[in-house]
Amino acid sequence: KRRRGGGATPRPPAPAPGVPRADDAGARAAREPARSTAPKGIATGHTPVLAAELLDLLAPAPGQTVVDCTFGDGGHARLVAERLGAGGTLVAIDRDPHAQARFDALAAEVPCAVRFIRSGYAEALEALGAEGVRAAAVYFDLGMYSMQVDARDRGFSYSYDAPLDMRMDPTEERSAREAVAEWDERTLARVLRDYGEERHAGAIARAIVRRRSERPIETTLDLVETITGAIPAPARFAGGHPAKRSFQALRIAVNDELGQLDRALPLAWSLLGVGGSIAAISFHSLEDRRVKRFLAGRAQGCVCPPELPVCVCGREPEAELLTRRSVTPSPEELAANPRAASARLRVARKLREEETG
């Protein structure tokens, strides 16, 4: 019988050793997971977003290998590590050197084996694949983490004055200050439009070029003043802080966040054994669309033209979507952690290895 991508998903084959399949009840719950409050009492002092939902869908189990691509404050990693037990392994990735100290503290407290890779996650996943690592789960918590936002010397926030930096890896060459000083007006406008979805990108880019010709833009407050002055007065008080989209755009560009994600998703998928799962928590539509498109492509079956009476392509889905729609925080979690408001979680399970040749 012909099967198209929108049809019933086939039952997954038996998972590889070390990658157990969720039981039927768990699988049903995973398809439409109930929202719940985030776990409390995390030793890092950081409340991980959508943590209960992530654990429910990934179902990390003793003896598995799990890869955390965005260690950050370590909140998700700690909860996962406690599930892996003495026979499991957690591989943590982060390009921010400040994450290393938090990882070292966590490593001394969790039962599983641990490993830290200081690198962009695309490069780290490629290296893990070259080593032959196989994982039961790989997950991403995209964007900034709390300590980056709250560290005044990092320049991520428009809420207080600080050096205009925004680098997740402070050893990288170009900071946001250098970007606004060096990029031409067309490049600035494109970055603000494409990465910030900023309606007033052209006006803001012109204002930046005009301002820097008079005096340097060196701090976050310098940039906020420049952006605010370029936006029409009625628009300054609609849709949140007037600099929000521009700061997002510059941060994404400086850190190549979307390029990293585009390269990392197929690499993460390749690390998974059959029955393993990939998850991503995103905080804006640019990330979420990429994750959604990637997972939907893996879950697609027949691609024959609709006029053909039977399938001749023979294509079978590689993935089962465990989240038909993105999972969002519960009202209780939002009350406890307003920063979670824009979070979206998507998860898929690997049904078979990719076809080659």
Predicted segment positions?
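S-adenosyl-L-methionine-dependent methyltransferase catalytic core, i.e., the SAM/SAH-binding region
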Residues: K1-G357
